[in-house]
From Swiss-Prot:
GO terms for biological process: sporulation resulting in formation of a cellular spore. It is an enzyme of class 2 (transferase). It catalyses: L-glutaminyl-[protein] + L-lysyl-[protein] = [protein]-L-lysyl-N(6)-5-L-glutamyl-[protein] + NH4(+). This is Protein-glutamine gamma-glutamyltransferase. The keyword Membrane does not apply. The gene is tgl. InterPro entries: Gln_gamma-glutamylTfrase_bac (IPR020916). The keyword Cell membrane does not apply. Keywords: Acyltransferase, Sporulation, Transferase.
Length: 245
């Protein structure tokens, strides 16, 4: 369900809305779901719809970029824009344009390798650039460190549930992973459509394919399969909207 300024948005309320055709299915799905989305204004709602579609597009762009998967300790990037911290974070160099540095990852992917959690943050930034434009992005995010979302300035939250939406970040957990290959303890993914996910390092796959891949990296004698957690990680759109408007 969608609540705008304390008022429930009903299906009949949007019948005459003039919005991009590709936003309609997502809008209707959000209205009909039991998951509650709260906004201060219609502008915030439209911002979320566009941002989610751009997250999907950004995930597909990163998939095609040639950027590779690497553990945090083996992270690397284009040294024109980024330095790598001892922890494996990509830190934006002083006076480098943030939007140009982020776009470089998509345009020159073979110069980059990073963890799947880092990939999610990069996807969020790529989507934001396409949603708000380079000038607003550069003004709002002048100091960027790409690591994971627990280290991030972006307002991000995770909540439990079984209802997922385009652009959600989900997690496939591998509880009996091989300790020698700990990077396969799980996989962060972006939901691209019904049973279609982008998983950095694996590609665009369905849920069974991701689970089969993770199961191939279990410890010897493992009995428990990898599985999709009942939770979603999302951008806090009302908070983000106040940052970038």
């Amino acid at each position: 369900m969608i609540i705008v300024s304390g008022q429930l948005l009903r299906p009949q309320d949007i019948e005459n809305w003039q919005i991009d055709q590709d936003l309609n299915p997502l809008l209707k799905e959000m209205i009909e779901t039991p998951v509650q989305f709260d906004y201060h204004s219609i502008a915030e709602l439209m911002f979320e719809l566009k941002l989610r579609m751009n997250i999907v597009a950004a995930a597909k762009t990163l998939h095609k970029s040639g950027a590779k998967f690497a553990t945090f300790l083996k992270t690397y990037g284009n040294t024109t824009y980024w330095r790598v911290s001892p922890e494996g974070a990509l830190e934006l160099k002083y006076r480098m344009p943030p939007s140009k540095a982020i776009r470089d990852i998509a345009e020159n992917g073979p110069f980059y390798a990073f963890e799947c959690a880092t990939a999610i943050v990069i996807i969020y930034y790529l989507a934001l650039i396409d949603t708000i434009g380079e000038d607003k992005f550069n003004a709002s995010f002048d100091r960027i460190i790409l690591y994971d979302w627990h280290y991030e300035k972006l307002p991000i939250y995770t909540e439990t549930g079984h209802h997922f939406f385009l652009g959600d970040c989900l997690y496939f957990k591998n509880p009996e992973f091989d300790p020698q290959k700990a990077q396969w303890r799980g996989e962060n993914v972006i939901l691209l459509g019904e049973d279609k996910y982008f998983a950095h390092g694996l590609g665009i796959l369905n849920g069974k394919q991701i689970i089969d891949k993770l199961n191939s990296f279990r410890k010897k004698g493992a009995l428990q399969s990898a599985y999709l957690l009942s939770q979603a990680t999302r951008l806090d759109v009302p908070s983000l909207f106040r940052i970038v408007r």
